[in-house]
Design a protein with these regions (language model features):
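A short, aromatic/hydrophobic, helix- or strand-capping loop or linear motif
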Residues: 6, 10, 57, 103, ...
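C-terminal catalytic domain of Rieske-type non-heme iron oxygenases
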Residues: 38, 112-353
């Protein structure tokens, strides 16, 4: 995972002159935005006495530690120690490359030189973006698998906006092919064809009620992750304004409702019936949460009984398994290529909820 760029935070949620703690992939970092607006990711603790740097103060383009005032520049070099006469060149924090685009802050958290940033052309242009970053209380890999699982719509989401789109009236015919970027999966239910891309190692691209959607599932730790979701809509000025207003209104209703994760957990514990959530504004997340939380903290894959409808899951696991085997053997894993013009061509129509 650390060999790739990953989103780590929503751009709109980080003000200039602000530092805050960040936990991604089981590791703690400091995330900040300088006064000029540049987002940075660096080590979480001061070199002096180990205080969290997220409690410090952003001064121009540098960060001053809250405890004894040690100051660090964008390269991680300590530029000031107020109580000391000198500031050796060797005093350096580790910093991580960042790139900000499509409403998200991306970081490369691996060793060595960062690879080229992947093209995100399908999310860029004259359209409008809507970004969401929900925290999910289960393993990120489980969510990736669920996003490729077409059959679960017929059962998990039988009461949902998908029902209005003919998604549950018949089981899908499935095709899944390996590509230079990961997998291309097509499902067909009568006249409805739905295309979904899986881009290695943890991203899904689809059409979601008329908008292009790309989601990155980034682990916080083994039992939770953030689903960084970018929806992009092109159209007339009025169409874009209406769509954006609708998304914001839905987001406001979700924010005012009980958190989807808590509702899902209560259903799994037997405290609520599934039907009690039918009017929740984030119903799809509640339903997926029930299905995924009910698998347990760590799903038991050794005893799975997979079938032909799980072809997407089998192929995706094989891609991961091959890369991990190469790394274990000291071999260079496959270079995955995200095409600049990769666009999903079929999906849910615009009339969904």
């Amino acid at each position: 995972m650390r060999r790739f760029w990953h989103p780590v935070f929503a751009s709109a949620q980080l003000d200039a002159g602000r530092a805050r703690p960040l936990r991604i992939m089981g590791q703690d970092f400091t995330l900040l935005r300088t006064q000029s607006g540049r987002a940075q990711v660096l080590a979480d603790r001061c070199l002096h006495r180990g205080t969290l740097l997220s409690t410090g103060t952003v001064e121009g383009e540098q960060l001053r530690c809250f405890y004894h005032g040690w100051k660090y520049d964008p390269s991680g070099r300590c530029t000031e120690r107020p109580a000391e006469r000198t500031c050796p060149e060797s005093l350096r924090l580790r910093t991580y490359p960042t790139h900000e685009t499509v409403g998200l802050i991306f970081a490369y958290l691996g060793d060595g030189e960062a690879p080229p940033f992947p093209p995100l052309d399908p999310l860029q242009g004259d359209g409008v973006l809507f970004v969401e970053t929900p925290l999910r209380p289960f393993n990120y890999f489980r969510q990736i698998e669920n996003a490729l699982d077409e059959v679960h719509f017929n059962f998990v989401h039988r009461v949902s906006p998908f029902a209005d789109q003919g998604m549950i009236t018949e089981l899908p015919e499935l095709r899944c092919e390996e590509t230079e970027f990961g997998l291309s999966r097509i499902s067909k239910r009568g006249s409805i064809e739905r295309q979904t891309y899986f881009l290695m190692p943890n991203s899904n691209a689809s059409l979601f009620f008329g908008a292009r959607r790309q989601v990155w599932r980034v682990p916080i730790d083994d039992t939770s992750h953030i689903s960084f979701t970018v929806d992009y809509l092109e159209g007339t000025t009025d169409e874009k304004a209406e769509w954006l207003a609708g998304r914001r209104e839905t987001a406001a209703r979700i924010a005012a409702a009980p958190p989807a994760a808590e509702v899902s957990a209560a259903i799994v514990r037997g405290e609520l019936p599934v039907e009690s959530a039918k009017d929740h504004p984030d119903l799809l997340s509640v339903q997926d949460g029930v299905a995924l939380l009910a698998q347990g903290v760590c799903a038991d894959r050794e005893n799975e009984a997979l079938g032909l409808s799980d072809i997407h899951l089998v192929k995706m696991r094989r891609l991961w398994s091959q890369d991990l085997s190469d790394l274990d053997a000291g071999r260079e894993p496959r270079k995955w290529l995200w095409p600049a013009k990769l666009k999903v061509t079929s999906g849910l129509p615009e009339t969904g909820g």
